[in-house]
A protein has these predicted regions:
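Terminal connector regions
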Residues: 314-345
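Short acidic/proline- and small/hydrophobic-mixed sequence motifs that coincide with surface turns
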Residues: 275-280
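Intrinsically disordered, low-complexity Pro/Gly/Ser/Thr-rich segments with frequent PxxP/GP/PP motifs
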Residues: 289-318
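Hydrophobic beta-strand positions in extracellular immunoglobulin-like domains
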Residues: 269-272, 312, 327
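HhH-family (HhH-GPD) DNA N-glycosylase catalytic core used in base-excision repair
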Residues: 286
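Disulfide-rich extracellular domains of secreted proteins
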Residues: 1-265, 269, 334-345
Length: 345
């Protein structure tokens, strides 16, 4: 049987927008060098918005089971001890999964006003460790969003010739599924829903997206003969989710470029054709991929038209530019590009 465990840790619904990320890190820390790792999580952070759920997950490899370390998130201590939720031995090494609930930290006034989520790890004793990957799941509370989710997490080693199956995978029969896995070297894996099979090659950290045909039954199997000679393959988590979100949709209703002295003034009318107001909005002027100008604008309400203008110096003026309209809502960022010819202005 596969070593390790995968457990259901959450099933439910909330008025919140869900965001998750899993990133390969591969950073080594040793006590002899007084190692300290600083890492900024690649997570959108709407200012002033409380979190409904926030879970930090670390995948750590070591030669020894005893490690002394401290973990902080946004300057607040998360753990002063190395206490993995799951540990699996692979050859001479151990792979550990550490799971932290950091909701209370992100809901402090200091964290709610920070645009980034920052983590530090200080190695204070024991053997060398390798931080293999970082995972983060966060749900931002708001009446414009509604999420249903079921989340399994842990650390499961599926060896050669082994298989692992799950039933009742999804939060409902119409949700999507994300299977998070890890393998140091390429490994062929077969996924089955009982009637169809999907063969994939996994290398490194992989987020495998599955449709709702896998909701009733999911089987994960490894090719091989139980010789143990191949690369290890781990299942780190499985997330089933269904989201509904009222979204803003910004459009450039009109564009009027006019020359004025030593610059070109572009007058714009921006409309919101969606059903929600953005948290933030901005205009970006691009010339062949280079940013020439950035301007924050008033986020328009649904149906509202906002008038704005942006200026480009003549000495920077190309034949044409791209106007990028960017807007953010909770954990999501969208943009729309429009080309503007300036040669005849």
């Amino acid at each position: 049987l596969p070593a390790g465990i995968l457990s259901e840790v959450y099933k439910g619904s909330f008025n919140a927008d869900l965001y998750y990320t899993f990133a390969e890190v591969s950073k080594t820390l040793t006590h002899s060098e007084s190692s300290k790792l600083s890492y900024t999580l690649d997570v959108p952070r709407p200012l002033g918005v409380p979190t409904e759920q926030a879970v930090l997950e670390l995948l750590v490899e070591s030669r020894e089971r005893h490690i002394d370390w401290k973990v902080r998130v946004n300057g607040v201590s998360v753990s002063k001890e190395f206490k993995p939720a799951v540990t699996v031995r692979v050859g001479e090494n151990y792979l550990h999964k550490l799971i932290y609930d950091v909701k209370s930290i992100l809901n402090t006034p200091e964290s709610m006003n920070k645009a980034r989520i920052h983590m530090t790890i200080r190695h204070e004793g024991g053997g060398r460790i390798n931080l293999r990957a970082v995972g983060f799941i966060v749900a931002y509370s708001h009446f414009d969003a509604y999420t249903r989710m079921k989340y399994y997490t842990g650390l499961l080693l599926v060896g050669e010739g082994e298989r692992y199956s799950m039933t009742d995978v999804c939060v409902d029969g119409d949700s999507l599924v994300d299977l998070i896995s890890f393998s140091p070297a390429p490994v062929p894996v077969t996924l089955s829903n009982g009637s169809n099979q999907r063969r994939i090659l996994v290398k490194g950290l992989a987020n495998i997206q599955l449709d709702n045909s896998y909701c009733g039954y999911l089987e994960i199997s490894r090719e091989g003969s139980n010789s143990g000679s191949g690369s290890p393959f781990f299942v780190l988590g499985l997330l089933s989710k269904k989201l509904s979100l009222r979204k803003p949709t910004l459009k450039l209703a009109s564009i009027t470029p006019m020359r004025s002295g030593n610059e070109v003034n572009i007058s714009l009318k921006i409309t919101n054709e969606g059903d929600a107001t953005p948290d933030e909005a901005m205009l970006v002027v691009l010339d062949k991929g280079f940013v020439r100008s950035v301007k924050k604008i008033k986020p328009p309400s649904p149906g509202e038209i906002v008038e704005e203008s942006i200026k480009i110096p003549l000495n920077l003026m190309p034949e044409g530019v791209t106007l990028r309209l960017v807007w953010k809502k909770l954990a999501r960022t969208q943009f729309e590009d429009t080309s503007v010819k300036l040669a005849q202005v």
